[in-house]
Every structure is written in structure tokens, then in C-alpha cells.
């Protein structure tokens, strides 16, 4: 059965005998049972062969670890047991080379696209399993793993492109020089960028490609226009590689690193590209081109273009602007990423502090600085760059060795994370148990041992990164003596401001003159003026470090004008000068937060608190802080005002962390919800006591607050209102309250609810707590404000519309006695778990989506909630899946759409490909929505937005620039709408 397999080996050269490592299995009995169940389903001789393979040392541990921790790899194993047997008996390096070569021959022999797609996907599946086994089993070092992944990707792109060009030649549109190699002289070439270009692909990586063509050097038929022809070929190439079929996909293709992707075609002429890079090319594009490599197509045309691009990437002189660009890249990472504490749970090993990106940036920065004059630095792989930098005496051998060790460790962590579900993720689980499970899959016996090694490497990387510029480790400069109050007529001041990076030095000089004149309200106190004058040079330097220095000055000026008592704040900034750039970011990108800081300067205390950039406080810590805030409140009004201040401070601090990039959207949404939940529970209890003091209590009374919508799902934003339902119960035999001003039954609870709403929405000098929306109560506006629990149960069973049960999937009791909570949760579960007609629910959900589109519109790309393919589509898919499947699969139920998608995939009611698309989209929408809700009060219009906001959004969307982000959003919405339509509008 296996003797003729490619790469077949005997004895100690076979893969199963070469394993030297493996996972630590947490529940071996459970994993063993699942493995044996699968083996029992196989043909007996095949099962016996596999059992023989598993007897080899680490082989059983690896298979059990996969069974326990990697649904993706176990799916590959179960899909083709003979393939696993073949791989365990092969010499892996020989097998992979022969697999690629054989697939190339088979693709060449094909004429049909479907057959080519199937062959490429079978290549990817077999290679993915083989490479994973070599990685998990320690057979290959991690950089051999990345090289193998890259070889597969390059081969797949080459095979797909060659097939497409041969098809075009058969149609008479191309006259190739060599029919067997139609890419020769065709004019089109494909650049592999990023990790693919450097031979460093990660396990579940997208492939970043740029496609160019030389219209003056093609083999096209005389009547064929180059641009539309090559655009069509490029689109077909992407489709061949990334379309999901029954065999899966080959690689997700990202074409957005091309110049101005939002407004250019997927294939660009070399002339247009060179024109763009010459006139508009940015530092990040220079850095990206360091790793660019021709991976397919017309190699000669590609080499000619890269030669022309060389002066753009490799500057011959370290001119002032180049140094400024390098410093800006470094400072931007410090401002947006650098304040976050190194952590274990939730830490992003790619872009988090001490992560892979910092190692890559460490190397690329010095390559950009010196590569023009030192050609030996022009290498693509990160570790090779570190070697060359060491040989050239740019870094020490110790730095090279420590960074190499850290890079290899972090890349292995990244791979193991991605192997679990074939998703391009980089963050460790958010909870301790999740990290413990991952640590075992990674081969550690405990979370603690893994955490020790992880933190060691992260600390090492952080230290080297911080010392990147030895003469200027903090990003500050020596400030020369300058008369900052001299005004715009002083040449020395203007020269100094230009040197700092200001583009409008006259405006800045005039503003400084106004500050030093002391006419602003905040400067009335002499002590404040003195402190500010001493702080001004450092302030100007700090503002110069902002992304847009001139805008930062304008924003800070507006802030100073709004301040009333700002002496302490100015003192704090003077003592914590590293926060100036962060405050400038807040003022420029989120005027709402700036206004809050101007009204309440004490909010700055939270930024200085060492805990600010640490872990987000959990519910218990929030409860402790809330209790301390409310201690000794002298009156009901003071109590509510302290709550308002607590809410504003929480919003400000969480919002600042969103802008600085030190919390994820999910963490922010949970934090906003935890704050709101704590406040709701506190206000609920306060109003109960206050109301009882006036009207007494009814025997057996109970009240509960149910959170719906974003609060229920724990996905709140800075501008979320609270969707609430209030339920009550009492002894029907004694409906009157026992107070001085008694009320009866339903009237008592209606008045109570009005008092509760008033506590939240009454406006004082400190604003409001929250806006309240109770329209999701039974019968909506037509129903009473508060509902009896029996009425609620009857309504959900007999009267509720489908959309109301959709909303109920997010219902969460957030304030009630334990017994009353349990009764309500039972009612909700009963309503959600009842049997439903899938087609009827699909029609209802689709009708509801169309109704929302008619009311809200769905054509605004940046209405991430309501746009076609936006968050509503994803939420509706999740809610549909719950309503249809909860009767037979109650474990699908969850308040979070992301969790529902995970459950649905695991339960087999949502294809993995669709789940991946929806999960990735939801995470991106959450990331961007958090920023938009924080920074924009109306519709977001990019052409009217400030550069600070666009820059923050670009980073949140993990895009190189806003144009690329816009293209990504558009493509994502198209994919989501396709999934929605296929599922609900069949």
C-alpha cells in the first residue's frame, strides 16, 4: 500500500521514527478513546498499520495531542487515513519535493479549471499535514518549516499562473515563446511580499502578492489590450488559490500591498507603479520592498522593475528626512503598542510588546538606514539580516543570538496557535485555562513553565528594541535654548520648529506666543504659569513626536482654552513627559475624550496610574473600585454624581487604551460592559432602597434587570446606550405596598421603573450615566415599562415574533436575586430551545434584514453595522443558527456571535470556511467600530476625517495605509454578504 509512495523511507529515516518532541496531553483517556473510535472505523489492515506507526516513541503523543487540541489537523487525518500512513513512513524532505514536482506535472496535464483546483488543494492538504507533523515532532527546525510552507506557496502560485497562461494561449490571446513555459516573456510577474518574499511563511498565513506587467514587452496577440487581460488573469489566479471548495482552499490571497489599492486595478503597469513610488511612496512601502521577491511569471521583467525600484528602497545618503521617517516608524510603534505591559494571557506574539514584529522592525530599520551604502544588508530573511548586521558590526553577536532564539521560539508559538483551527491568529488565549491548554499542545507540562520561557524571550526582545537608537533611547532630543515667546518674526525659533518637524512654523510660533502671554483662563495662577513655562520646551518636543505635529499643537491649544483649573494637570504632564504624545493623540483623534479631560483634569490620574496599561480590571476589581468611589457619599444626588464620574473616568481610560492600541476590541467591549453592569447593579439596589423608603415594599417582591443588545452580548462601545428589560414578581394575594405612600401591584413597579430610568438619564454638571432604551420589552412601546415574570413567559411562548427571539439570544440577567435570576434564565432557555422550522426562520431573518436595509440603508461602506455584509449580517447568521439548532444542540447558545460561530462550526452546522470568514470579519468590524464610536459622533466620512483618526483606524485594521484598509473592508463585506445570502436566502 505504501511501497510506491513518494518519499517512502525505511528504518530510522521514516518520519514516525524521527519524532523527538510532542504535546503534553491533558486528558489522555479522552483523547485515546477518540483516537481508538476513529481507528475502529477504518479498514482493519490500515488500522493495524497505523497502530504499528503509533507505537514509535513520540508518534502516539503527537496524534493524541492533535486529537485533543487541533480540530483542523484531526480533520485532515480523518479525511484520508492512507495519507497519514503514507506520511508517517516517508522521508519528509524527499516526500515534499516529490509531492510538489508530481503535482506540477499533473496540473500541466490538466485542461479543466476544476481539476487544477482539486490538485492544488490536495497538494496543500498533504503538505500542511506533513509540515505540521515535522514541526510538532521537532523533526524540522522552525525556519525549515517556514521555508517548506513558502515552497508550497510559491509552487502553487507558479502552477496556477502557468495553467491560466496556457489556457489563454489556447484561446489565441497569447503567443508564448515556449508553449510549455508561457510565462517566459509574457510581461506579467508576481511579487511575493512579506513573509512569503522572505521565505518565512507562517502556518496559516495569507500570501501577500503584488502583480505588475510591462505593457511594452508582452507576448499578447496584437488585438489584446494588456490592462484588462492581465487584470482578468490576476483575478483568476486569486480565485484558483483562495476559492473554497469541497477540498478546502490553497492560500488566502491578499493583493492590497499594491500602490493605492482602493483605486487601482489588481494588476498594475510597471510605469504606473514606478510613477507612484517615485512621487508618493512611503517609508512602510520601502520597508515592504526589502522582502519583495519574484515568485512567478516573467522573471526578466520582474528583475528589471526591481532594479528600477532599488533607488526608492535603498537611499544612498542618510538624509534628514530618512532619519525622521525611521524615528517616526519607531515612535509610532511606541505610542500605539509600546505602553502595553508584556503579558501571557491574550498577548499577541506578532505585534505585542516584545513580539515578532519588534524583531523584524529591529532588523528592517537598520537595513533602511544603511542598506543604500552597504549592499550586503539587502537581504530578505529576518535572521539572515541579523547575521549580516552582526558581521557588519551594526549589532553585537549577543544581540543577534538572543533575538534569533526569541524569534524562533515566538514563530513556533505562532505556528502552534494557527495549527489548532487553520486561522491566521497571533494572540494567546485570554484566560489562564486557555493558555494552559495551549501550553500542553506546545509541549509544556504546565502554563507556568511555558509562561516563564515566553516572558523571558519577550523581555529580551523588548530590551533590544528599546535600545535600537543608543544615543536616544527615549525618543527625546537635546533642546537648545530658544525664546519660545518671540513669535513668528524670530528666524531662530522658526528654524528650530522646522528642525523638530513642524510644517507650519509660523502658526506654531504664534500659538506659543499666545500661551506664554498668559491670557488663557488656565494661566491665571502664577504658579501654573511658572510650571508651564518650565515645561514648554519638553511639551513642544512631545507634540513634535505626534503623528501630525501641527494638528497636535492646534488640538492642545483648543484643550488649553477649555481648561479652567489645569495647574495640576500641567504639573503631571511635566513630570510624565512620555505621555505628551499620547495626550496629543487623544486630543487629535477623539475630541470627545479631550473635552472630558478639559472638564475633568483629574482623569489624567488614571493615565499615570501604573495599572493603566496593565491588565483590564475584572468585575471583582471594578466592584472594589466602585465601592471606594461611593464611600461616604452624603446624599442621593452626590451618590449619583460619583457614579457619573466613575463612568466617565472608565470611558476615558478605556477609550485612551483603544486609541493607543493596548487593548483589543473584544477586551474593550467587555470592559465597557463590566463598567455598565456594575453601575446598573449599584443603581438598581440604590433605587430599591430609596423607593422603599417612600412607598414601602410588596410582600414577596422581586425585580430583575435583563441586559439586551450590546450590553447583553458584552460588546459595548463608548457610545452605547443600555437596552434593558425590567421584570418583577410579587405575592398576588397581598398586592399593596406597606409604606407611607402605598402603591399597588403593577403601578408600584411602573413607578419604580420610571425612577430607575430617571437615575440613569437625569443630566447634571457631570452629564448622564447612560441613555436607556427599553423598546425590546414585550410588545415594545405598546407594552408596560415593567413586565410581570408570568406575562414575560407567556409572551415569549405565544406572542413573540422571530426578531424578538433573535434579540433574546443576547439576553443576560445582570441584577436580580439568585432565585429570581434562575427563574428568568429558565424562561429564556425554554423560549430559545423550542423546535422551529428552519425555512420559516430563514425567511423571517431575511425579511428582517431587508426591512433594516430599507430603513437604515446598506450602501455606506463605513456603516460597519448596517452595510451589506456588515455586522448585522453576521449577528443575524449567529441568531438564525441558534434559533434553528438550539432544540437539538443547546450548546450552540451564547450571547456572543463569535462564540456562536465557534460552536456552530464545532457542531457541524456551519462550514469551517464560512465560520472563518465571519469570525475574521466580526473581529475587524469590532476593532474599527470601537474607534469610530469613540471618535465620531455622526456618520464617518473619510474625506472629512482628520489624519490622526485615519491613522488610528489603519493600525486597528492592521493595514499598511487607509487605502488598503478601505479595500479590505469592501472585500470583507462582499464575502460576508455571500455567506449570508447562501445561508438565508436560498
Curated annotation (Swiss-Prot):
GO terms for molecular function: [glutamate-ammonia-ligase] adenylyltransferase activity; [glutamine synthetase]-adenylyl-L-tyrosine phosphorylase activity; ATP binding; magnesium ion binding. Its cofactor is Mg(2+). One of its GO terms (cellular component) is cytosol. One of its GO terms (biological process) is regulation of glutamine family amino acid metabolic process. Residues 1-473 are annotated as: Adenylyl removase. Its EC number is 2.7.7.89, 2.7.7.42. It comes from the Bacteria. Residues 478-986 are annotated as: Adenylyl transferase. It catalyses: [glutamine synthetase]-O(4)-(5'-adenylyl)-L-tyrosine + phosphate = [glutamine synthetase]-L-tyrosine + ADP; [glutamine synthetase]-L-tyrosine + ATP = [glutamine synthetase]-O(4)-(5'-adenylyl)-L-tyrosine + diphosphate. Disulfide bonds: none annotated. Keywords: ATP-binding, Magnesium, Multifunctional enzyme, Nucleotide-binding, Nucleotidyltransferase, Transferase. Gene3D superfamilies: Beta Polymerase, domain 2, Nucleotidyltransferases domain 2. Belongs to the GlnE family. NCBIfam families: PRK11072.1 (NF008292), PRK14108.1 (NF010706). Involved in the regulation of glutamine synthetase GlnA, a key enzyme in the process to assimilate ammonia. When cellular nitrogen levels are high, the C-terminal adenylyl transferase (AT) inactivates GlnA by covalent transfer of an adenylyl group from ATP to specific tyrosine residue of GlnA, thus reducing its activity. Conversely, when nitrogen levels are low, the N-terminal adenylyl removase (AR) activates GlnA by removing the adenylyl group by phosphorolysis, increasing its activity. This is Bifunctional glutamine synthetase adenylyltransferase/adenylyl-removing enzyme. It comes from Bradyrhizobium sp. (strain ORS 278). The lineage of its organism: Bacteria, Pseudomonadati, Pseudomonadota, Alphaproteobacteria, Hyphomicrobiales.
Amino acid at each position: 500500500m505504501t511501497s510506491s509512495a513518494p518519499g517512502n523511507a525505511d528504518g530510522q529515516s521514516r518520519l514516525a521514527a524521527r519524532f523527538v518532541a510532542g504535546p503534553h496531553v491533558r486528558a489522555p483517556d479522552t483523547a485515546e478513546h477518540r483516537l481508538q473510535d476513529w481507528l475502529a472505523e477504518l479498514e482493519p489492515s490500515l488500522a493495524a498499520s497505523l497502530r504499528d506507526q503509533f507505537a514509535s516513541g513520540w508518534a502516539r503523543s503527537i496524534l493524541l495531542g492533535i486529537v485533543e487540541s487541533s480540530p483542523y489537523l484531526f480533520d485532515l487525518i480523518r479525511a484520508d487515513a492512507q495519507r497519514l500512513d503514507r506520511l508517517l513512513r516517508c522521508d519528509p524532505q524527499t516526500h515534499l519535493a516529490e509531492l510538489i514536482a508530481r503535482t506540477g506535472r499533473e496540473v500541466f496535464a490538466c485542461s479543466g479549471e476544476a481539476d487544477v483546483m482539486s490538485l492544488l488543494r490536495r497538494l496543500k492538504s498533504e503538505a500542511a499535514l506533513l509540515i505540521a507533523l515535522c514541526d510538532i515532532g521537532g523533526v524540522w527546525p522552525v525556519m525549515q518549516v517556514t521555508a517548506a510552507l513558502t515552497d508550497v506557496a510559491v509552487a502553487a502560485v507558479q502552477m496556477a499562473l502557468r495553467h491560466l497562461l496556457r489556457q489563454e494561449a489556447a484561446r489565441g490571446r497569447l503567443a508564448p515563446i515556449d508553449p510549455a513555459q508561457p510565462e517566459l516573456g509574457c510581461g506579467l510577474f508576481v511579487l511575493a511580499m512579506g513573509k512569503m518574499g522572505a521565505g518565512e511563511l507562517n502556518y496559516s498565513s495569507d500570501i501577500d502578492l503584488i502583480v505588475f506587467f510591462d505593457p511594452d514587452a508582452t507576448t499578447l496577440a496584437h488585438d489584446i489590450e494588456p490592462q484588462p487581460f492581465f487584470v482578468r488573469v490576476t483575478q483568476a489566479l486569486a480565485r484558483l488559490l483562495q476559492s473554497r471548495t469541497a477540498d478546502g482552499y490553497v492560500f488566502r490571497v491578499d493583493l492590497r500591498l499594491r500602490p493605492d489599492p482602493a483605486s487601482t486595478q489588481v494588476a498594475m503597469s510597471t510605469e504606473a507603479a514606478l510613477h507612484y513610488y517615485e512621487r508618493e511612496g512611503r517609508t512602510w512601502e520601502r520597508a515592504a520592498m526589502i522582502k519583495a521577491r519574484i515568485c512567478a511569471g516573467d522573471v526578466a521583467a520582474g528583475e528589471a522593475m526591481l532594479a528600477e525600484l532599488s533607488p526608492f528602497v535603498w537611499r544612498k545618503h542618510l538624509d534628514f528626512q530618512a532619519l525622521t521617517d525611521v524615528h517616526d516608524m519607531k515612535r509610532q510603534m511606541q505610542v500605539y503598542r509600546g505602553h502595553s505591559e508584556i503579558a501571557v494571557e491574550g498577548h499577541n506574539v506578532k505585534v505585542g510588546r516584545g513580539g515578532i514584529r519588534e524583531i523584524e522592525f529591529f532588523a528592517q530599520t537598520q537595513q533602511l538606514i544603511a542598506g543604500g551604502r552597504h549592499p550586503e544588508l539587502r537581504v530578505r530573511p529576518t535572521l539572515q539580516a541579523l547575521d549580516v548586521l552582526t558581521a557588519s558590526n551594526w549589532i553585537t553577536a549577543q544581540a543577534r543570538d538572543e533575538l534569533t532564539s526569541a524569534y524562533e521560539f515566538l514563530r513556533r508559538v505562532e505556528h502552534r496557535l494557527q495549527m489548532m483551527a487553520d486561522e491566521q491568529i497571533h494572540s494567546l488565549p485570554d484566560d489562564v485555562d486557555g493558555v494552559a491548554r495551549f501550553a500542553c499542545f506546545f509541549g509544556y507540562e504546565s502554563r507556568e513553565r511555558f509562561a516563564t520561557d515566553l516572558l523571558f524571550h519577550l523581555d529580551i526582545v523588548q530590551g533590544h528594541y528599546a535600545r535600537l537608537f543608543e544615543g536616544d533611547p527615549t525618543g527625546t532630543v537635546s533642546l537648545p535654548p530658544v525664546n519660545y515667546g518671540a513669535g513668528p518674526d524670530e528666524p531662530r525659533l522658526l528654524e528650530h520648529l522646522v528642525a523638530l518637524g513642524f510644517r507650519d512654523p509660523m502658526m506654531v510660533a504664534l500659538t506659543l506666543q499666545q500661551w506664554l502671554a498668559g491670557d488663557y483662563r488656565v494661566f491665571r495662577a502664577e504658579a501654573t504659569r511658572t510650571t508651564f513655562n518650565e515645561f514648554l520646551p519638553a511639551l513642544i518636543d512631545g507634540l513634535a513626536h505626534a503623528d501630525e505635529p501641527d494638528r497636535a499643537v492646534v488640538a492642545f491649544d483648543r484643550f488649553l482654552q477649555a481648561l479652567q483649573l489645569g495647574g495640576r494637570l500641567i504639573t503631571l504632564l511635566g513630570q510624565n513627559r512620555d505621555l505628551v504624545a499620547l495626550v496629543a493623540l487623544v486630543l487629535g483623534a477623539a475630541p470627545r475624550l479631550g473635552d472630558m479631560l478639559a472638564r475633568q483634569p483629574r482623569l489624567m490620574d488614571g493615565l499615570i496610574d501604573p495599572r493603566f496599561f496593565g491588565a483590564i480590571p475584572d468585575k471583582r476589581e471594578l466592584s472594589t473600585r466602585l465601592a471606594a468611589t461611593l464611600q461616604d457619599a452624603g446624599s442621593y444626588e452626590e451618590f449619583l454624581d460619583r457614579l457619573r464620574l466613575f463612568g466617565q473616568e472608565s470611558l476615558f481610560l478605556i477609550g485612551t487604551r483603544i486609541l493607543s492600541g493596548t487593548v483589543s476590541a473584544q477586551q474593550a467591549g467587555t470592559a465597557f460592559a463590566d463598567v455598565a453592569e456594575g453601575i446598573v447593579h449599584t443603581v438598581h439596589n440604590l433605587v430599591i432602597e430609596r423607593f422603599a423608603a417612600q412607598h414601602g415594599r410588596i410582600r414577596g417582591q422581586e425585580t430583575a434587570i435583563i441586559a439586551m443588545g450590546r450590553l447583553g452580548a458584552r460588546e459595548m462601545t463608548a457610545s452605547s446606550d443600555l437596552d434593558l428589560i425590567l421584570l418583577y414578581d410579587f405575592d398576588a394575594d397581598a398586592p399593596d405596598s406597606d409604606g407611607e405612600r402605598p402603591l399597588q401591584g403593577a403601578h408600584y413597579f411602573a413607578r419604580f421603573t420610571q425612577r430607575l430610568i430617571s437615575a440613569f438619564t437625569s443630566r447634571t454638571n457631570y452629564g448622564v450615566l447612560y441613555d436607556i432604551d427599553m423598546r425590546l420589552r414585550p410588545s415594545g412601546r405598546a407594552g408596560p415599562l415593567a413586565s410581570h415574570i408570568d406575562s414575560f413567559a407567556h409572551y415569549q411562548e405565544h406572542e413573540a415574533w422571530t426578531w424578538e427571539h433573535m434579540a433574546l439570544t443576547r439576553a443576560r440577567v445582570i441584577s436580580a436575586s439568585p432565585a429570581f435570576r434562575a427563574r428568568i434564565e429558565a424562561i429564556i432557555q425554554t423560549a430559545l430551545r423550542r423546535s422551529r422550522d428552519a425555512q420559516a426562520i430563514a425567511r423571517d431573518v431575511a425579511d428582517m434584514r431587508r426591512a433594516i436595509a430599507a430603513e437604515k440603508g446598506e450602501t455606506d461602506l463605513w456603516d460597519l453595522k448596517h452595510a451589506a455584509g456588515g455586522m448585522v449580517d453576521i449577528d443575524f447568521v449567529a441568531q438564525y443558527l441558534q434559533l434553528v439548532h438550539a432544540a437539538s444542540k443547546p450548546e450552540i447558545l451564547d450571547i456572543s456571535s463569535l462564540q456562536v460561530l465557534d460552536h456552530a462550526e464545532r457542531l457541524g452546522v456551519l462550514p469551517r470556511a464560512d465560520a472563518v470568514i465571519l469570525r475574521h470579519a466580526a473581529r475587524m468590524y469590532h476593532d474599527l467600530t470601537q474607534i469610530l464610536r469613540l471618535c465620531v459622533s455622526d456618520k464617518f466620512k473619510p474625506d472629512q476625517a482628520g489624519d490622526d483618526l485615519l491613522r488610528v483606524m489603519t493600525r486597528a485594521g492592521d493595514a499598511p495605509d487607509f487605502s488598503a484598509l478601505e479595500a479590505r473592508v469592501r472585500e470583507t463585506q462582499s464575502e460576508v454578504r455571500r455567506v449570508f445570502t447562501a445561508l438565508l436566502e436560498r
